[in-house]
Amino acid sequence: MQNILVVEDDHDLNQAICYSLKKSGYGTYGAESAESGRTEFLRNRIDLVLLDVNLPDGEGFSFCRWIKFI
């Protein structure tokens, strides 16, 4: 199973995306901030990240750069 991390600060949208992906057969992890996204990324085997670029605690582009160096 492929695992997808959804980093989206809008709770309802985050839940809707995760629900839709789960129904399509993917494993999903939801995070509502860059910090919780980093935690989920390190804690789980993530194959794909769906990322909001405007997060309350950091810009999504910074998150992408962080992933690149992991």
At which residue positions do the language-model features occur?
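N-terminal/domain-start alpha-helical segments
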Residues: 1-70
